[in-house]
Amino acid sequence: DTLSALSGIDKNQLSRANQVDAALLENNLRSGIWSTEVNQQWAWNPLYYQSLAGGALYTLMSREFAPLPRRLENAAARMEKLPALLAQARSELQPARVPAPHAATYAQQNPGVKSIVNDMILAQKDQLSGARRARLEAAAAACNAALDEHQHWIETTLQPAAQADYRVGAEAF
Protein backbone atom coordinates (compact mmCIF):
# COMPACT_ATOMS: atom_id res chain seq x y z
CA ASP A 1 0.00 0.00 0.00
CA THR A 2 1.67 3.18 -1.20
CA LEU A 3 -0.03 5.42 1.35
CA SER A 4 1.21 3.24 4.22
CA ALA A 5 4.72 3.19 2.79
CA LEU A 6 4.65 6.95 2.39
CA SER A 7 3.53 7.46 5.99
CA GLY A 8 6.55 5.44 7.11
CA ILE A 9 8.96 7.99 5.67
CA ASP A 10 10.40 10.60 8.03
CA LYS A 11 9.55 13.74 6.07
CA ASN A 12 11.99 15.80 8.19
CA GLN A 13 14.84 13.86 6.59
CA LEU A 14 13.76 14.95 3.10
CA SER A 15 14.80 18.07 1.23
CA ARG A 16 12.17 20.80 1.04
CA ALA A 17 11.44 19.91 -2.59
CA ASN A 18 10.98 16.24 -1.68
CA GLN A 19 8.77 17.19 1.28
CA VAL A 20 6.53 19.07 -1.14
CA ASP A 21 6.52 16.09 -3.52
CA ALA A 22 5.66 13.74 -0.65
CA ALA A 23 2.78 15.99 0.43
CA LEU A 24 1.49 16.19 -3.14
CA LEU A 25 1.70 12.42 -3.52
CA GLU A 26 -0.08 11.81 -0.20
CA ASN A 27 -2.87 14.25 -1.05
CA ASN A 28 -3.26 12.71 -4.49
CA LEU A 29 -3.48 9.21 -3.01
CA ARG A 30 -6.01 10.31 -0.38
CA SER A 31 -8.07 12.04 -3.06
CA GLY A 32 -8.07 8.88 -5.17
CA ILE A 33 -9.17 6.77 -2.22
CA TRP A 34 -11.94 9.24 -1.35
CA SER A 35 -13.09 9.34 -4.98
CA THR A 36 -13.24 5.55 -5.15
CA GLU A 37 -14.68 4.73 -1.74
CA VAL A 38 -16.90 7.74 -0.99
CA ASN A 39 -17.67 9.83 -4.05
CA GLN A 40 -18.20 6.95 -6.51
CA GLN A 41 -18.83 9.13 -9.56
CA TRP A 42 -19.43 6.11 -11.76
CA ALA A 43 -22.61 5.38 -9.77
CA TRP A 44 -24.22 8.83 -9.74
CA ASN A 45 -22.62 11.13 -12.31
CA PRO A 46 -23.58 10.38 -15.91
CA LEU A 47 -21.35 13.22 -17.06
CA TYR A 48 -18.40 11.03 -16.04
CA TYR A 49 -19.34 8.69 -18.90
CA GLN A 50 -20.09 11.60 -21.23
CA SER A 51 -16.59 12.88 -20.68
CA LEU A 52 -15.10 9.46 -21.40
CA ALA A 53 -17.15 8.87 -24.55
CA GLY A 54 -16.99 12.34 -26.04
CA GLY A 55 -13.44 12.99 -24.95
CA ALA A 56 -12.16 9.75 -26.44
CA LEU A 57 -13.32 10.83 -29.88
CA TYR A 58 -13.12 14.62 -29.75
CA THR A 59 -9.56 14.88 -28.49
CA LEU A 60 -8.45 12.39 -31.13
CA MET A 61 -9.99 14.36 -33.98
CA SER A 62 -9.50 17.94 -32.78
CA ARG A 63 -5.72 17.84 -32.52
CA GLU A 64 -3.41 17.25 -35.46
CA PHE A 65 -0.84 15.18 -33.56
CA ALA A 66 -0.78 12.44 -36.21
CA PRO A 67 -1.76 12.10 -39.86
CA LEU A 68 -5.53 12.13 -40.37
CA PRO A 69 -5.74 8.56 -41.74
CA ARG A 70 -4.04 7.24 -38.61
CA ARG A 71 -6.39 9.25 -36.36
CA LEU A 72 -9.38 7.91 -38.31
CA GLU A 73 -8.17 4.34 -37.79
CA ASN A 74 -7.81 5.07 -34.08
CA ALA A 75 -11.29 6.60 -34.08
CA ALA A 76 -12.66 3.39 -35.58
CA ALA A 77 -11.03 1.38 -32.80
CA ARG A 78 -12.47 3.70 -30.16
CA MET A 79 -15.94 3.68 -31.72
CA GLU A 80 -15.86 -0.12 -31.68
CA LYS A 81 -15.44 0.05 -27.89
CA LEU A 82 -18.03 2.76 -27.26
CA PRO A 83 -21.10 0.46 -27.19
CA ALA A 84 -19.51 -1.51 -24.32
CA LEU A 85 -18.77 1.72 -22.44
CA LEU A 86 -22.38 2.86 -22.81
CA ALA A 87 -23.64 -0.53 -21.65
CA GLN A 88 -21.35 -0.26 -18.64
CA ALA A 89 -22.73 3.21 -17.90
CA ARG A 90 -26.27 1.81 -17.89
CA SER A 91 -25.12 -1.01 -15.63
CA GLU A 92 -23.19 1.13 -13.15
CA LEU A 93 -25.33 4.27 -12.92
CA GLN A 94 -27.88 4.09 -10.15
CA PRO A 95 -30.68 6.39 -11.35
CA ALA A 96 -31.94 7.15 -7.83
CA ARG A 97 -28.47 8.52 -6.96
CA VAL A 98 -28.31 10.76 -10.04
CA PRO A 99 -29.21 14.43 -9.55
CA ALA A 100 -31.90 15.62 -11.98
CA PRO A 101 -29.72 18.46 -13.38
CA HIS A 102 -26.98 15.94 -14.20
CA ALA A 103 -29.46 13.66 -15.99
CA ALA A 104 -30.92 16.60 -17.94
CA THR A 105 -27.47 17.78 -18.98
CA TYR A 106 -26.52 14.26 -19.99
CA ALA A 107 -29.66 13.96 -22.12
CA GLN A 108 -28.68 17.14 -23.94
CA GLN A 109 -24.98 16.30 -24.32
CA ASN A 110 -25.22 12.67 -25.41
CA PRO A 111 -26.31 13.60 -28.97
CA GLY A 112 -23.12 15.63 -29.21
CA VAL A 113 -21.14 12.41 -29.38
CA LYS A 114 -23.12 11.49 -32.51
CA SER A 115 -22.21 14.83 -34.03
CA ILE A 116 -18.54 14.05 -33.39
CA VAL A 117 -18.98 10.68 -35.09
CA ASN A 118 -20.85 12.09 -38.06
CA ASP A 119 -19.36 15.57 -38.49
CA MET A 120 -15.76 15.09 -37.40
CA ILE A 121 -15.08 11.45 -38.22
CA LEU A 122 -17.38 10.21 -40.99
CA ALA A 123 -17.02 13.52 -42.82
CA GLN A 124 -13.35 12.57 -43.32
CA LYS A 125 -13.93 8.95 -44.40
CA ASP A 126 -12.63 9.68 -47.91
CA GLN A 127 -9.16 9.76 -46.34
CA LEU A 128 -9.41 5.96 -46.04
CA SER A 129 -10.11 3.27 -48.61
CA GLY A 130 -10.86 -0.42 -48.80
CA ALA A 131 -11.02 -2.39 -45.58
CA ARG A 132 -9.92 0.56 -43.45
CA ARG A 133 -12.79 2.68 -44.72
CA ALA A 134 -15.26 -0.18 -44.34
CA ARG A 135 -14.11 -0.68 -40.75
CA LEU A 136 -14.59 3.03 -40.02
CA GLU A 137 -18.09 3.03 -41.51
CA ALA A 138 -19.11 -0.13 -39.64
CA ALA A 139 -17.73 1.21 -36.36
CA ALA A 140 -19.57 4.50 -36.84
CA ALA A 141 -22.85 2.73 -37.63
CA ALA A 142 -22.57 0.53 -34.53
CA CYS A 143 -21.55 3.50 -32.41
CA ASN A 144 -24.48 5.61 -33.64
CA ALA A 145 -26.90 2.75 -32.96
CA ALA A 146 -25.48 2.37 -29.44
CA LEU A 147 -25.77 6.11 -28.86
CA ASP A 148 -29.42 6.02 -29.99
CA GLU A 149 -30.12 3.12 -27.63
CA HIS A 150 -28.37 4.96 -24.84
CA GLN A 151 -30.33 8.16 -25.49
CA HIS A 152 -33.55 6.15 -25.21
CA TRP A 153 -32.38 4.75 -21.85
CA ILE A 154 -31.44 8.24 -20.64
CA GLU A 155 -34.87 9.62 -21.51
CA THR A 156 -37.00 6.68 -20.34
CA THR A 157 -35.07 5.30 -17.37
CA LEU A 158 -32.45 7.71 -16.08
CA GLN A 159 -34.22 11.07 -16.27
CA PRO A 160 -37.53 9.96 -14.70
CA ALA A 161 -35.73 8.36 -11.73
CA ALA A 162 -33.03 11.02 -11.21
CA GLN A 163 -34.00 12.59 -7.89
CA ALA A 164 -30.78 12.79 -5.86
CA ASP A 165 -29.33 15.90 -4.30
CA TYR A 166 -26.43 17.22 -6.32
CA ARG A 167 -24.52 18.35 -3.22
CA VAL A 168 -21.92 16.01 -1.73
CA GLY A 169 -23.07 16.78 1.81
CA ALA A 170 -21.25 17.32 5.08
CA GLU A 171 -20.91 13.62 5.89
CA ALA A 172 -19.08 12.72 2.69
CA PHE A 173 -17.14 15.94 2.43
Spell out what each predicted region is:
Residues 1-173:
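N-terminal maturation segment of proteins
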